[in-house]
UniProtKB/Swiss-Prot annotation:
Protein name: Matrix metalloproteinase-19
Cofactor annotation comment: Binds 1 zinc ion per subunit.
GO annotations of cellular component type: extracellular matrix; extracellular region; extracellular space
Biased composition (Pro residues): 274-287
Lineage of the species this protein comes from: Eukaryota, Metazoa, Chordata, Craniata, Vertebrata
GO molecular function terms noted in the UniProt entry: metalloendopeptidase activity; serine-type endopeptidase activity; zinc ion binding
Amino acid sequence: MNCQQLWLGFLLPMTVSGRVLGLAEVAPVDYLSQYGYLQKPLEGSNNFKPEDITEALRAFQEASELPVSGQLDDATRARMRQPRCGLEDPFNQKTLKYLLLGRWRKKHLTFRILNLPSTLPPHTARAALRQAFQDWSNVAPLTFQEVQAGAADIRLSFHGRQSSYCSNTFDGPGRVLAHADIPELGSVHFDEDEFWTEGTYRGVNLRIIAAHEVGHALGLGHSRYSQALMAPVYEGYRPHFKLHPDDVAGIQALYGKKSPVIRDEEEEETELPTVPPVPTEPSPMPDPCSSELDAMMLGPRGKTYAFKGDYVWTVSDSGPGPLFRVSALWEGLPGNLDAAVYSPRTQWIHFFKGDKVWRYINFKMSPGFPKKLNRVEPNLDAALYWPLNQKVFLFKGSGYWQWDELARTDFSSYPKPIKGLFTGVPNQPSAAMSWQDGRVYFFKGKVYWRLNQQLRVEKGYPRNISHNWMHCRPRTIDTTPSGGNTTPSGTGITLDTTLSATETTFEY
């Protein structure tokens, strides 16, 4: 089972701008990294800029309904110490409402309880887990059937620091309580080291945590409403627990409203379920350890995104994060993208597919998009933003275009040969991106190349993507890119390093 949550140690020595952090400060920094607020640099991964930590703290405080100061105050520390779910917090940035991560293509699901916690009588624990499913079927047209053996859509298990069920181990009592996979993987894991209870304020309430994780398994992300079941932090036992309106709205957005019961023989008009359209043949969920990438992007807040088919995941020093439907994060964006690029200069994210381009600011599409590509060839291979000249590069075949986002770029001399500027990289790259220090990465097949600030491939490349980026178990490394080799060359092409003084409308 490939369990895809983000995990980091809490006592690793780190530095901020060369200053060693004490153990009292390490946990908050790792917390921000673990739950998606702070991205560790890929290169020199023990260095953080103070402004990055301040921005991450502000985002966490805003999401936690705390006073937003960007400072590590007592209230922020206390919030970080609260037990919580192990899934990241990619909140819905468009509104404060629920976040949808995917859905099952059926409404009758089976579940299997593989084992039970030792702190509760078996019948009590089993009843709590069953009630967790009932909470959702009470408000949505879903039915659940428990099976005692064989395959099941959703599988629940308790395990600790070492387990064959999941490669991501738990951390002992407190902190991370449970985690789950999104549809249609169906795994729900609970930390067996927790003191699981029912009907008491002591310990951790099993029914509430189980209902939260089943919500993830059904396709719901975290909610920014602190009283919602799908809030990331466990708020304690609630004797008269019921779903928050945001929880209900989220599950009904996925599966429709539960039809009212028709009493006697009276005819009652029922509202048709409002279910988002789902592709008839969605692309299969990729394996980050073996999939060839469609696109890579260093996005806002320093988060690295990898794209394949209809799915996207974040990449950190801990490996791949959870998989999300592309359209769940960027509403209106299709899968199977050709290229993706984020520009810190303009805060714009551009996605390319076929002869169209989409532009987003964070997770909100800009008005008037998508637009048709008129002056650049369709079906691009890759795109990247280079911080040293603040321009966007677009790649197709053996050529590239250099684009100033804030000026009407003269493309009459483009495309120019890739090998003339980027020495030692392949034609037709499948993905590309740059790092904050000016290094550039090209991806093709199972391998990648790293270029220095002079845009020349460094020694020792290409290297394996799965091992060095996704941190998967070592496999036989094939360093031959798919389709032809390249000839390093340097023709002295000069980069355009001038920036436009005023913003103008760009015709794509």
